[in-house]
Curated annotation (Swiss-Prot):
Enzyme class (EC, first level): transferase
Residue numbers binding ATP: T63, V64, G65, G66, S67, G68, K69, T70
Protein name: Tetraacyldisaccharide 4'-kinase
Protein origin, superkingdom: Bacteria
Database matches in InterPro entries: LpxK, P-loop_NTPase
Length: 338
């Protein structure tokens, strides 16, 4: 199913699949009307929005699927800490059923808090609260920890929470796909939305004017079971299979090729896939397993000794850092009435 959707949205040579796109256009029109109405209700104050007592940085995208938001959030946490801030993070907690707000503590299973929150906290130990209501999550976070700036992960379309800085993350290769709104295309909002954000980060090739190029730099292979750095050659003459349950699995497979790792097979799972030992062993068929860090947080409890994950770090131009920090200070002064 995911392969078909990718062809519909991103393959310009999809041929007959464009017939299906045409059939979906009326639904995209309805989606446009509903989302436009919702935005206008917030803009006119007919739907309530709220501002928190600390600056809010929203990281998001306008397309469905992976673009590099999670590495960007981790990058921002580290950047803010280096510059004397005490950041916290709020997120939805995709795929997890709970009411109200929930604190994310390092070591909590991904099936209780979501794979991306589990990964962010495991990597950074940042204070984090998840909840469908970002305003409530932000207030719960401030009640819990003395944070002085909040990062809202994947919160671009959550207009109930007023924000001070918006950062759009784009996949450089896919960009806006066929340029159509859901479900005929991958867009949550029109391309016009890019012009309203403060910064656009382009993950990979193809950054344009007023865009900052971002690269995901692979780190050292680590054991899924205990997180220890692996010094041995994980490829072992093609005796491994690569798996990925992320928004854009091909990006992970391409990264392996770029660093000279050539597994004997690869398998793309759905984004936010709930893994089991049986499911992975069926794909692995006795071979070692290579996976992303996001996959690893869901497999740690039953991982085997020959399962490894590859962490990545976002690398962004220094000009972005300086412009972001300058804008943050300016927005802080406005909020404090200086």
């Amino acid at each position: 199913m995911q392969a078909l959707v990718n062809r519909l949205w991103y393959d310009r040579q999809a041929g007959v699949h464009w017939l299906l796109v045409l059939l979906l256009l009326p639904l995209s029109g309805l989606f446009y009307l509903l989302t436009s109405l919702r935005r206008q209700l917030f803009r006119l104050g007919l739907k309530a929005s709220a501002r928190l007592d600390v600056p809010v940085i929203v990281v998001g995208n306008i397309t469905v699927g992976g673009s590099g938001k999670t590495p960007t959030v981790i990058y921002l946490i580290e950047l803010l800490r280096r510059n004397g801030y005490r950041p916290g993070v709020i997120s939805r907690g995709y795929g997890v059923e709970f009411s109200g707000c929930k604190r994310v503590i390092a070591g909590m299973p991904a099936n209780e808090v979501g794979d991306e929150p589990a990964m962010i906290v495991a990597r950074t130990q940042v204070p984090m609260v998840i909840g469908s209501d970002r305003v409530a999550a932000g207030k719960a976070l401030m009640d819990w920890q003395a944070v002085d700036v909040i990062i809202s992960d994947d919160g671009l379309q959550h207009y109930r929470l007023k924000r001070d800085i918006e950062i759009l993350v784009l996949d450089g290769k896919r960009r806006f796909g066929n340029g159509l709104l859901l479900p005929a295309g991958p867009l949550r909002e029109g391309r016009w939305r890019q012009g309203r954000v403060d910064f656009t980060l382009v993950n990979g090739e193809g950054s344009g004017p007023e865009e900052f190029e971002m690269a995901l730099a692979p780190g050292n292979w680590r054991s899924v079971a205990d997180g220890q750095v692996v010094t041995a050659n994980v490829d072992k003459s093609h005796e491994s299979v690569a798996i990925a349950g992320i928004g854009n699995p091909q990006r992970f497979f391409d990264t392996l090729s770029e660093i000279g790792v050539q597994p004997s097979g690869q398998h793309a799972f759905d984004d936010h896939q709930a893994y089991s030992l049986e499911a992975i062993e069926t794909v692995a068929a006795g071979r070692g397993v290579l996976m992303t860090e996001k996959d690893a947080v869901k497999c740690r409890e039953f991982a085997k000794s020959n399962w490894w994950y590859l962490p990545v770090d976002a690398k962004i131009a220094p000009e972005f850092e300086q412009q972001l920090l300058t804008l943050l200070k300016r927005r802080e002064n406005v909020q404090q009435g200086n």
